[in-house]
Each structure stands twice: as C-alpha cells, then as structure tokens.
A protein has these predicted regions:
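Amphipathic, small/basic residue-rich leader segments at the start of a protein or domain
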Residues: 12-149, 153
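Short acidic, glycine/serine/threonine-rich loops at helix termini
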Residues: 129-134, 161-164, 196-200, 224-227, ...
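Internal maturation/activation junctions in enzymes
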Residues: 153-156, 166-212, 217
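A short core secondary-structure module
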Residues: 211, 215-236
Length: 236
C-alpha cells in the first residue's frame, strides 16, 4: 500500500466516524508546529524525501500523515484514556481470559482500521517505508494520547523481527501475524533483572522436536494478554 492510499483510508475512517454522529473529544493536544520544526527545519529530513527508498514520500505527504494522526490522537485514541487508566484490564481466573475496556477496544480499532500498523510492517508484507524520524514523530502523538494503543499495536513491529531475523518457520509466523493482526508480547524483565537485561537468569533448552523448554521467571510482560486479537506471539 502506498502513502496516498494509507492517508485516504485513515481520512475516510475519520469521516465515517463523524458522519455516524459520534462525539470526538479527548485530553490530548499535539503541538504539530513543534514537530514540523524539529523534523524539517532543525533536522532537515525533507532532504532525504523523494529519493531512493523514500521516492514516493514528499514533505506534503509527510505533513498530511502528521496532521491525520494528530486528529486521530486528539479524538478517537484519547477518548478511552481515562477509562482505560481507571479500569485497566479484566482478568477472569476461572477461564484465564483477559479483556480490555470496550472504549479502549474502540480506540485501538480506529488505529488499526486506519492502517497505521503498515508503518511497522516490512514492505515485503504490505508495509509502508518511511524515515524513522517521521515514524517516531507519529508515535509521539499516539503515545501522548494513549500509550496503550501504541504498545498493543507493537505486534507488527515484532513481526519485523521474526521476518528479518527468524528461521523459515518463523518467517511464516511473521506473515500470519500481519495477515491475521495477531498481537505480540516482549518478555524481558525478571525479579532481579529490570533494565539490566544482561542479569537475566532464565534459560531455554531446545528439545528434539524443535520446541524449547523455558526455565525461569518473567514478569511485567508488555501487552501480555488481551482480547484484541485471536492470538498473541510471545517473544522471550
């Protein structure tokens, strides 16, 4: 999908949202002028646009993306921030199911339906290639509005890891992660190893059938469970 199609899809989603009569409101206001200054006047990122791997991206298109994610962040994404923060997730010990608040699911789906996940997806799997500086400018607004949306949507970025660094079998899993919109978790933290991941003591022992037995403790699992998708791939 090219950049113009991505923008058209996202803008259409916003139009239908307003047409349906939903009230748009939120706690967050993005400083787009500051972001524009940092990207193009301070860092001069427009110098790399329109060339090589970014030949289909110019400054106007980049600004269009920023303006659209600003609208989405200030409205749809921000709308569930308070309720999501106060309620958190609901865990059913009898079934083991985890559910996020309905309002948060609505915010998350607005991000996914706008196809912003393509920015974290390998081009070979339908992703859209943009400079890292622009990608993180977009992420800044999503994180400022509703951090959990960005974190839960990181499954697509994890699919990149599996696709570029994984085995042939793991590459197939990466494709499924994209096609079926699976989530992903990152399991690093241990009781005695927080930011010092080198202090981790968990061990993985490969078995004859190709599986691994993991011995140890992991905690504070990022986006470890939810009902946002049919499956979650755990990166340990």
């Amino acid at each position: 999908m090219n950049l113009h199609m991505l923008l058209t899809s996202s803008i259409l989603g916003l139009y239908l949202h307003v047409l349906g009569g939903d009230q748009l409101m939120g706690h967050y206001t993005a400083n787009l002028r500051d972001i524009e200054f940092c990207l193009f006047e301070l860092l001069g990122r427009d110098e790399i646009l329109g060339k090589s791997i970014y030949k289909d991206l110019d400054r106007d298109t980049a600004m269009g993306m920023l303006e659209e994610i600003k609208r989405l962040s200030e409205n749809d994404l921000a709308a569930s921030f308070v309720e999501g923060d106060r309620m958190g997730v609901d865990f059913n010990p009898a079934t083991g199911d985890v559910k996020v608040p309905a309002s948060f699911k609505k915010s998350y789906n607005s991000y996914i339906e706008g196809e912003w996940w393509r920015l974290d997806t390998p081009p070979e799997l339908g992703g859209t290639k943009i400079p890292a500086s622009l990608r993180w400018a977009i992420a800044e607004m999503v994180l400022g509005s509703n951090p959990s949306v960005h974190i839960y949507a990181s499954g697509y970025a994890f699919a990149q890891v599996a696709y570029y660094l994984g085995t042939d079998e793991q590459k197939k899993i990466a494709k499924l992660m994209i096609e079926r919109h699976w989530g992903a978790s990152m399991m690093l933290t241990e009781p005695d190893a927080g930011s010092d991941v080198g202090a981790g003591r968990a061990k993985a022992i490969q078995q004859a059938d190709g599986t691994w037995h993991i011995i140890g403790t992991k905690r504070f699992i990022t986006s470890g469970d939810s009902d946002l998708g049919e499956n979650i791939v755990h990166f340990v």
